[in-house]
């Protein structure tokens, strides 16, 4: 399934990878709660060239409300690592998938397995203010245990000043 079949894919440049992982986790949650449907779920995933999520992960997914702004996600770990658009990986583990400069995102930083360098400090930078004058959106933290349990934490934000940083707290 290609996103371009449903919308202007350039406006959601980071979405296909994030959505593919979402589907794998949703499938795992479904199988955990309806084990008799496992073969059906696996078959539907295979038809779409998707995979059932089986490993723990923590994802930080940033969305925003207008396509004319450039909002960047920054994550710092307890070991002094800093991931952002110019340095997309932390030595402690984790990867920023893409730097989305046009469209609505999402920008996603994912840690495979269990996080090993907590606490993580989360912030955003209003890199380029668009004609709207403000950046508004959401950082969603998704924790998947690899066994079919998924939890969410939402951290909304509004950023008003070009080049400003907004602290979105820590994650343990």
Where are the model-predicted features located?
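Alpha-helical protein-protein interaction scaffolds
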Residues: 1-35
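Intrinsic-disorder/low-complexity signal
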Residues: 36-172
């Amino acid at each position: 399934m290609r996103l371009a079949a449903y919308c202007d894919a350039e406006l959601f440049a980071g979405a296909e990878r994030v959505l593919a992982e979402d589907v794998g986790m949703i499938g795992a949650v479904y199988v955990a709660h309806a084990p008799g449907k496992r073969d059906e779920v696996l078959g539907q995933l295979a038809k779409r060239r998707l995979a059932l999520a089986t490993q723990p992960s923590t994802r930080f997914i940033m969305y925003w409300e207008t396509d004319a702004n450039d909002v960047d996600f920054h994550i710092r770990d307890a070991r002094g690592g800093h991931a952002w658009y110019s340095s997309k990986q932390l030595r402690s583990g984790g990867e920023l998938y893409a730097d989305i400069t046009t469209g609505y995102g999402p920008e996603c930083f994912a840690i495979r397995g269990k996080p090993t360098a907590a606490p993580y400090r989360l912030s955003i930078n209003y890199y380029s203010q668009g004609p709207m004058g403000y950046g508004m959106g959401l950082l969603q933290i998704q924790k998947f245990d690899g066994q079919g349990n998924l939890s969410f934490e939402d951290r909304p934000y509004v950023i008003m000043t070009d080049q400003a940083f907004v602290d979105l707290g820590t994650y343990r």
